[in-house]
């Protein structure tokens, strides 16, 4: 392989690695994993210095700069995909049912989720409001279960900043 092509490919790969670690570290920091974020930042900086020095030592070739920039963009996507797979943290899922159904909370509880429910008033009558706290990795599965039970449900999820007390199950049933 030509030395110029080797440098371009190396810059591209090293920058993907750097930005992937950077993205995951940033997400770890936001989720409160301080020590893991700090440890990953050590590797992030080592890789960053290597990538930047490769580009700065070879600024005469525009392909090196482009490889750095494209590697940066690809690294963000890869980092986000990794974080989606890891799915750290919890989500609060709020559900407004299409119709008032007293059995719905128990159906969801039977799947292993903790549910708080109450009567709500909608434009077209009584609804049931549910609040469910679950691990992010269970979000899609929970949505699927809710839609199977009540296809017309309105579902919104958000990430809580802090959690204290409440009902927890050891494992959500498959």
From Swiss-Prot:
It comes from the Bacteria. The keyword Transferase does not apply. The chain crosses the membrane at residues 4-24, 36-56, 62-82. Signal peptide: none annotated. It is found in: Cell membrane. Its main location: membrane. The keyword Transmembrane helix applies. Keywords: Cell membrane, Membrane, Transmembrane, Transmembrane helix. It is a multi-pass membrane protein. HAMAP family: UPF0316. NCBIfam families: PRK04164.1-3 (NF003192), PRK04164.1-5 (NF003194). PANTHER family: UPF0316 PROTEIN YEBE (PTHR40060:SF1). This is UPF0316 protein lmo1776. It comes from Listeria monocytogenes serovar 1/2a (strain ATCC BAA-679 / EGD-e).
